[in-house]
Amino acid sequence: CCSKSHRMRMSRGQQGIGISAAGMYGQLTTGKPVTIISRTGPRAAAHFFEVQIDTKKNEPLVHENKQIEWEQPQGTQVAIEVEGKYQKGRASVDEWLEQTSIANPHVKLTYHTPEGETKEYPRTYHELPPSPREIKPHPYGIEFGMFLKMLQDTKSHSVSGLLASDFCRVSSQLADEICKAAKVSPHTKPRDLKGSSAETLYRTIQDTKIMAPPTNCLSPIGEKAILSGLYKQIKGEFYTAVSRPPAVYRGNPFVIEAGLAYGAAPQDQNKPRQPAMPKAEGERDEEDSELARVIRYANRVPLLYQQSACSTFKAVLSTTWKNYGVTQSRGALPGGPMVIFVHMASVWVPFTSESKEAIADYDEIQKEITLALRECGRRLGLFLRRRERAASEYRRRNIFELYIEEVVEACNRLKGGTLPKEKLKAQLQKIATSRTGGLKTDEALGKTGAGPEGLPHSIIVTAEGVEGEVDLAARVQA
């Protein structure tokens, strides 16, 4: 999202309207001001403010400004008391914080609920994300009205100077070529360019081949951080994450990231299993009828509403999950215990409305989301096929091992009791292991402690432990 001054840099917010609206709502419902404590560093004093909004003049009213003692070395605390109905479940404050914790595993969150509970979302990823750098707007991402405004507001004294200095990826040579193609003098003053001449220049810019904008204005989450966030909050057997290379839509750079958590948490082998209840004819397991859950993000912020209108959700529906061993009805989400994570990082996220609840359909964005989901699905399919083959081989091995003792005893009787039984038992055990996939079977079932071979940026969880790329700092207990 860009700010109102069109700073081309990825950021969580846009124009500060959200915090202003929250403060206004608190003021209207409770009559109490917003309280702010801020300190810029350990050596600086902490300042306390009480602020309200003058609704007639749209100006802040600072009721109190004083220095106080504060235990925090630096940071800002904002407190707003509002009147509202607290509820849990889907699209609630609780879910928003949970999803925020997944996409920001480098952050520690402490949530004090209105019911008196305290929920901790610990920090599990200890690398801070890179700070995005501001870039100049790309010519492809500017609307005609904004282009006209730039012509009037620029400090450049010529059109070619405007193109070269106010846009990224436009050199002086390319600026002269654009002016020549538009039949506009490069030395024309920008303010003198109006009407059809300005429109011709704008169309020429859009038709000119210009290098894609730089991507250092973005700060994607990263595959390891996504894995850490998913593993922290969601119980499962298999996790994977994909970060796509940077792409461009309408001159705006963006990065699509996807993640996937599949399966239920493995049961502890030491705990006694509950006996399975008999099922009526045609009855299915609950997991078989369960649909996947989609969690969507834009610039690390969860999108909880208007799911069906979002480009992310449409890309999930259009992906053929059956190819990866997952059940899916036509036009529906895939079935089974699965959470699908999709994040879009961009300097300008194309939301469908001002409420910023769903991402608009652009072919370039849809393509990148689909490619990321397919890669996640490919890894999931590989895991499921490998696990099924390994489970089959392991069952065969168990059958062989059931008869090893009897074979050893029979051979010992034939030898008149002089056979070295332990040696023969070890040899037969070795044969049974080699004939049923050997170490590959053990690795696929998580019995060796080795990482998931052939599954980059993935985690496999078994009752024996965890394999793959993950920070084992802390896992939130449900």
Locations of the language-model features?
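GHKL-type ATPase core
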Residues: 2-141, 191-192, 196-201
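Structured core elements
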Residues: 18-21, 35, 77-81, 110, ...
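Extended, structured, electrostatic nucleic-acid-contact surfaces
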Residues: 144-168, 184-187
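Helix-hairpin-helix
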Residues: 160-181, 478
